[in-house]
Regions:
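N-terminal donor/sugar-recognition subdomains of glycan-related enzymes
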Residues: 1-246
Length: 246
């Protein structure tokens, strides 16, 4: 007798209400179909998602199918309803809180923050530590993003003769690293702020959904330069703000 396929077993177990066995069989069926049979992949992933299977396995499958162009509209709606909308209130609250902080911050010179609904990126939570960024214009998902990777990705201190200048730092961990490892101007007797250059205002604003700025701004070490504001680096704090650190 020919051995029954994992998919056939999964469907039969689902019919009988044997949820645990169906989840196991659908997990095997998904592995068998991966990258080859998108209709079966979707069937299996939906069952796992809706009946207590590993949600990450289902989530990864939804993303994979979407990227491969399979039922994109349906899958985007599914992922939005399941993963984004339950968290949108928190994302919006964090964004608006960070905007309020930057409006009061003396060294953020651009203030035309877009409405939350107009941001170019949406962040779909993946787990407690990571997100999937989604480009609204391109309708594409990027790679998983970890705001707090416990590592520094670059050398911020290549030129010690000038204040630190770093471009497009979107890691909470690295921002806190800079805050903690650059001494205040008052302590070193010269201008020693950390200059953060962001090359795209919309993208910078989008990341305010997932960053926590309050602990970064308290000591006023950071200077935010947006796009062509890079021409202001380094700022003469004595001439502009009346601060003499010598």
């Amino acid at each position: 007798m020919k051995e029954r396929s994992a998919l056939a077993i999964a469907r039969r177990m689902a019919e009988l209400g044997e949820q645990g066995h169906a989840v196991t069989a659908y997990t095997l069926a998904l592995a068998d179909a991966r990258d080859r049979q998108p209709d079966i992949e979707l069937e299996a992933a939906l069952y796992l998602f809706e009946h207590g299977g590993n949600y990450k396995v289902a989530y990864d499958t939804f993303q994979s199918l979407y990227r491969r162009g399979f039922q994109r509209e349906h899958l985007l709606e599914l992922m939005t309803q399941a993963f984004y909308l339950p968290n949108v209130k928190l994302l919006k609250s964090r964004y608006e809180k960070n905007c309020r902080l930057l409006r009061k911050y003396p060294y953020c010179f651009r203030q035309d923050f877009p409405a939350f609904e107009d941001l170019p990126l949406r962040f779909y939570p993946y787990d407690d530590e990571s997100y999937l960024p989604f480009s609204v214009k391109a309708e594409t998902f990027g790679e998983r993003l970890y705001p707090r990777p416990p590592a520094v990705s670059r050398n911020f201190f290549q030129n010690l003769d000038k204040p630190v200048l770093a471009a497009d730092v979107y890691s909470q961990y690295e921002l806190e690293y800079l805050r903690d490892n650059v001494r205040k101007s008052e302590w070193v007797g010269r201008e020693n702020h950390v200059y953060l250059h962001y090359t795209d205002w919309g993208i910078f604003c989008a990341y305010l959904q997932i960053l926590s700025l309050r602990p970064l701004l308290e000591e006023e070490k950071l200077v935010f330069l947006i796009e062509d504001e890079i021409s202001q680096y380094p700022i003469d704090f004595q001439a502009r703000f009346g601060m003499d650190y010598s």
